[in-house]
Amino acid sequence: MASVSELACIYSALILHDDEVTVTEDKINALIKAAGVNVEPFWPGLFAKALANVNIGSLICNVGAGGPAPAAGAAPAGGPAPSAAAAPAEEKKVEAKKEESEESEDDMGFGLFD
């Protein structure tokens, strides 16, 4: 979980981005000081450097666009490639999802007191 210092810097950077102002250490410090939050001195510089060459708008839009989940187990040493082992696991997941969706379609929630 993020600390208060990290959250203050994050919110400051988002405010600056929303106002279409360049994110700098001084501007982050100014917002944090105006909010009355005590922050360790390295946080604003760290966030300013991290966000210097980043398109914050695209970063916000792509937050939930992660890759596929890793396979359930690791392949044993000298075993088949992970992609070959992951294919049956993916088929099982798809079948399980289909079964769950069929069950949810059948049960409309009318049996609350059964």
Swiss-Prot record:
The modification N-acetylalanine is found at A2. GO terms for molecular function: deubiquitinase activator activity; protein kinase activator activity; ribonucleoprotein complex binding; structural constituent of ribosome. Residues 69-88 have a biased composition (Low complexity). GO terms for cellular component: cytoplasm; cytosolic large ribosomal subunit; cytosolic ribosome; synapse. The keyword ATP-binding does not apply. Keywords: Acetylation, Isopeptide bond, Phosphoprotein, Ribonucleoprotein, Ribosomal protein, Ubl conjugation. Gene3D superfamilies: 1.10.10.1410. Residues 69-114 are annotated as: Disordered. Ubiquitinated at Lys-92 and Lys-93 by RNF14 and RNF25 in response to ribosome collisions (ribosome stalling). GO terms for biological process: auditory behavior; cellular response to cAMP; cellular response to Thyroid stimulating hormone; cochlea morphogenesis; craniofacial suture morphogenesis; cytoplasmic translation; genitalia morphogenesis; hard palate morphogenesis. There is a cross-link at K92, K93 (Glycyl lysine isopeptide (Lys-Gly) (interchain with G-Cter in ubiquitin)). The modification Phosphoserine is found at S101. Signal peptide: none annotated. Residues 89-100 have a biased composition (Basic and acidic residues). PANTHER family: 60S ACIDIC RIBOSOMAL PROTEIN P1, LARGE RIBOSOMAL SUBUNIT PROTEIN P1. Belongs to the eukaryotic ribosomal protein P1/P2 family. Heterodimer with RPLP2 at the lateral ribosomal stalk of the large ribosomal subunit. Plays an important role in the elongation step of protein synthesis. This is Large ribosomal subunit protein P1. It comes from Rattus norvegicus. The gene is Rplp1.
